């Protein structure tokens, strides 16, 4: 492998309010412009662009340091990027007007800046100001809401290859003034770039949030937008101990089901290879996928197994979506679909493997025990059940995502929650399973695997 010819380090550190920093001066837009221009000029194999912490000279940011020469640029804007790429990376000639030439003065300014920042932090602490990380966590909903609204209104598609706020508003069917405020906020978050009053998608937003991209994640992200409404009832849910009725009418099923299954499919498509490798297909001729959603796991197992047949059990409206994925994979002969209710239905019999993925968190303890007992009845002697879910530590205060997801179940279900390894092991033993094993996988969820006793 050939080393990069140039390494570019761009400061993108966020600092407490009132303290100068490159991120407040548009460093994220500069980073996006650099990456896009390097790619456009075909220099991706020669130039590596990396975001880093504070370089100093914060009042003159955004700052870039370029190696191997150690060239330092200050006050860089997105408009400067084409010249930097063309002259410096393409021609080997640094852009003189952006250079910091006096190294001694720069070092002195960096030292003074450091003292100034430390003094400001001490003053904030003495005044009882919230630590910046805590303040950002409390206000984090603002950034999330701005992005979700942009996706709900299809703003990134409206911006396309470039659009003014009035043009985008016309395409979105929204108010021009409010649209510009929204697009400005999204640009500040780094998902749009704004040049001369015209908004442009960044490589990130064009890839995931604009129509026509092969990695279009809009439908999956709409599931998060739907969850927003549920999470707004969290305070009431904690008082009541369960999900509470929302004040607004529930969206039609197709507006809920499609985004939900799209989100689950996107996640399952990434995780399925890990699950198949961890579980294996040896000795598996028939598999039942309980609440199998888009059939992503059944497809992965059928593709990995030698003649393995999988059956997906789910609601009719979900199976209509699963059918599209099964047919697209060319596996209609190996993956079959069965309409049913996993909460009450007999699951059948004669299966070598039963997969219960992302189901148990929707149910209460008694419901999970009942489901696992029916899974046992569906298995041949010695057959395995595989439960994939968020698995909490014994004290239930970690991992972080599993603990937060438990709240997601509080606001969205009657009895659901995230559960610990000990709870799963207890249910499996009570349901008639043995050889219970916790298999840890990359990512937030793990597997509980057990074998039918007798």
Model feature map: region roles:
Residues 5, 284, 382:
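Phosphate-coordination loops involved in phosphoryl transfer and adenosine-cofactor binding
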Residues 124-184, 194, 281, 290-454:
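Alpha-helical subdomain
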Residues 124-163, 170-171, 177-285:
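Conserved Class I S-adenosyl-L-methionine-dependent methyltransferase catalytic core
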Residues 62, 190, 383:
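Glycine-centered, phosphate/nucleic-acid-interacting loop/turn motifs that mediate DNA/RNA or nucleotide
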Residues 5-25, 48-68:
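Local cysteine-cluster metal-coordination motifs and their immediate loop/turn environment
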Residues 71-124:
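Fe-S ferredoxin-like electron-transfer domains
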Residues 24-49, 71, 75-90:
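Ferredoxin-type iron-sulfur electron-transfer modules in oxidoreductases and energy-metabolism complexes
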């Amino acid at each position: 492998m050939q080393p990069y010819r140039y390494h570019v380090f761009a400061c993108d550190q966020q600092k407490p309010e009132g303290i100068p920093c490159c991120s407040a001066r548009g460093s994220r837009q500069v980073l996006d412009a650099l990456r896009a221009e390097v790619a456009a000029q075909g220099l991706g194999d020669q130039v590596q662009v990396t975001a880093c912490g504070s370089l100093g000279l914060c009042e003159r940011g955004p700052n870039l340091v370029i190696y191997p020469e150690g060239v330092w640029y200050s006050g860089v804007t997105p408009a400067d990027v084409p010249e930097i790429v063309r002259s410096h990376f393409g021609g080997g000639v640094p852009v003189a007007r952006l250079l910091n030439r006096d190294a001694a003065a720069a070092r002195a300014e960096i030292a003074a800046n450091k003292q100034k920042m430390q003094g400001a932090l001490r003053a904030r602490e003495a005044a009882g100001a919230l630590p910046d990380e805590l303040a950002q966590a409390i206000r984090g909903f603002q950034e999330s809401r701005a992005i979700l609204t942009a996706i709900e209104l299809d703003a990134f598609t409206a911006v396309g290859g470039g659009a003014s706020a009035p043009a985008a508003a016309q395409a979105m069917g929204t108010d021009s003034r409010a649209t510009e405020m929204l697009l400005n906020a999204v640009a500040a978050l780094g998902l749009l770039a704004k040049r001369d009053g015209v908004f442009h998608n960044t490589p990130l937003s064009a890839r995931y949030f604009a129509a026509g991209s092969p990695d279009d994640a809009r439908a999956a992200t709409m599931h998060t937008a739907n969850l927003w409404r549920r999470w707004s009832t969290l305070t009431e849910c904690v008082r009541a101990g369960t999900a509470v009725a929302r004040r607004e009418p529930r969206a039609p099923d197709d507006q809920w089901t499609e985004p939900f299954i799209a989100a689950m499919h996107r996640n399952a498509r990434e995780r399925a290879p890990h699950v198949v490798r961890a579980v294996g297909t040896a000795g598996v001729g028939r598999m039942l996928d309980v609440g199998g959603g888009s059939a992503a796991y059944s497809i992965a197992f059928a593709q990995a197994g030698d003649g393995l047949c999988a059956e997906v059990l789910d609601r009719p409206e979900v199976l209509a979506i699963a059918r599209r994925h099964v047919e697209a994979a060319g596996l209609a002969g190996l993956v079959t679909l069965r309409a049913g209710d996993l909460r009450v239905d007999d699951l059948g019999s004669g299966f070598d493997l039963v997969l219960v993925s992302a189901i148990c968190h929707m149910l209460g303890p008694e419901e999970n025990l009942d489901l696992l007992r029916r899974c046992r009845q569906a298995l041949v002697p010695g057959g395995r059940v595989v439960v994939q879910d968020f698995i909490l530590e014994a004290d239930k205060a970690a991992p972080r995502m599993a603990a937060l997801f438990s709240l997601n179940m509080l606001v969205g279900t009657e009895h659901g929650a995230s559960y610990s390894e000990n709870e799963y092991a207890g249910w499996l033993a009570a349901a008639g399973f043995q050889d219970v094993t916790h298999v840890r996988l990359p990512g937030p969820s793990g597997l509980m695997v057990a074998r039918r006793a007798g």
